């Protein structure tokens, strides 16, 4: 079976990356070695799969939802001993390899409508860690989301997502990806980013992570308001004011002006549940 008769399906969010330069940059960013096993999410027609198989990686394990594409991928790569394929929804399908092991790196062209849930599954949440931790994830995302993930405090794109992701992983830009690099072209700009999740010893203790989550939820639901107004409803002002001052936070700041580490310091100083 060839892919020539298969058209992109909007319900699956299918936009196939076809730009050779971007495909090469994705593989290069993963820095694949002979002992690496790669989880590829949404291989589509196999343009990236082909390059991954040309790398030194020991194993490429792909998960594809579209049954027609699964047949085409089997026809194209089924004879490759280093390739395995699972049909299913990546939000629900087992992520382990066919032999029961786990990939240590992820490469994914994520359907933009499942970005949040998929990030949570692959990297976890502050108060719900994922095991095992991947060495790195190279992800093709909608530019707006990618910018929020790696935004700096004070930028309009800095959000609760920024804080969460920056407490879970090192985040960096690989390359911008304009719509013309896809078939069919999406209506939005995209970016490839590299995430390097922190090992367990660098992650927040669960109780502290839960307090950070509660603070973020409370503060960012009214992101244009000063912290004096958003946090006073859940923290006694007589506690909040000296605590904020002790960790270098001004209560006249808005939540998008406070760095991830400062949120942790604020949560650490609380002796009560938020």
Curated annotation (Swiss-Prot):
Q: Where does S-adenosyl-L-methionine bind?
A: 15, 17, 42, 64, 89, 109
Q: What is its EC number?
A: 2.1.1.182
> Can you cite an annotated GO cellular component?
cytosol
Entry superkingdom: Bacteria
User: What keywords tag this UniProt record?
Assistant: Cytoplasm, Methyltransferase, RNA-binding, rRNA processing, S-adenosyl-L-methionine, Transferase
Q: Name one GO molecular function term.
A: 16S rRNA (adenine(1518)-N(6)/adenine(1519)-N(6))-dimethyltransferase activity
As its record notes, the protein acts as a catalyst of: adenosine(1518)/adenosine(1519) in 16S rRNA + 4 S-adenosyl-L-methionine = N(6)-dimethyladenosine(1518)/N(6)-dimethyladenosine(1519) in 16S rRNA + 4 S-adenosyl-L-homocysteine + 4 H(+)
Q: Which family does it belong to?
A: Belongs to the class I-like SAM-binding methyltransferase superfamily. rRNA adenine N(6)-methyltransferase family. RsmA subfamily.
Q: Which PANTHER family match?
A: DIMETHYLADENOSINE TRANSFERASE, DIMETHYLADENOSINE TRANSFERASE-RELATED
- What's this protein's name? Ribosomal RNA small subunit methyltransferase A
Taxonomy, top ranks, is:
Bacteria, Bacillati, Cyanobacteriota, Cyanophyceae, Synechococcales
Gene (name only): rsmA
């Amino acid at each position: 079976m060839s892919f020539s008769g298969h058209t992109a399906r909007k319900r699956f969010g299918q936009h196939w990356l076809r730009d050779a330069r971007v495909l090469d940059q994705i593989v290069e960013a993963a820095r694949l070695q002979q002992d690496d096993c790669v989880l590829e999410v949404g291989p589509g027609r196999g343009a990236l799969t082909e390059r991954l198989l040309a790398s030194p990686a020991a194993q490429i394990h792909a998960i594809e939802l579209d049954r027609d594409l699964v047949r085409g991928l089997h026809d194209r790569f089924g004879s490759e001993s280093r390739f395995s394929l699972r049909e299913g929804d990546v939000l629900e399908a087992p992520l382990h390899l066919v032999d029961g092991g786990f990939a240590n790196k992820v490469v994914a062209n994520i359907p933009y409508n499942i970005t949040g849930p998929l990030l949570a599954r692959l990297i976890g949440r502050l108060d719900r860690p994922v095991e095992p931790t991947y060495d790195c994830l190279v992800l093709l995302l909608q530019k707006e989301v990618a910018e929020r993930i790696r935004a700096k405090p004070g930028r309009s794109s800095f959000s609760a997502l920024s804080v969460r992701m920056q407490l879970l992983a090192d985040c960096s830009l690989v390359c911008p990806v304009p719509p013309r690099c896809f078939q069919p072209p999406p209506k939005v700009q995209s970016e490839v980013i590299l995430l390097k999740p922190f090992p367990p010893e660098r992650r927040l203790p669960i109780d502290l992570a839960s307090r950070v989550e509660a603070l973020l939820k409370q503060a960012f639901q009214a992101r244009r308001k000063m912290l004096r107004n958003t946090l006073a409803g859940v923290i006694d002002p007589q506690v909040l004011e000296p605590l904020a001052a002790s960790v270098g936070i001004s209560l006249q700041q808005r939540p998008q002006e406070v760095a991830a580490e400062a949120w942790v310091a604020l949560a650490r100083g609380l002796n009560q549940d938020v």
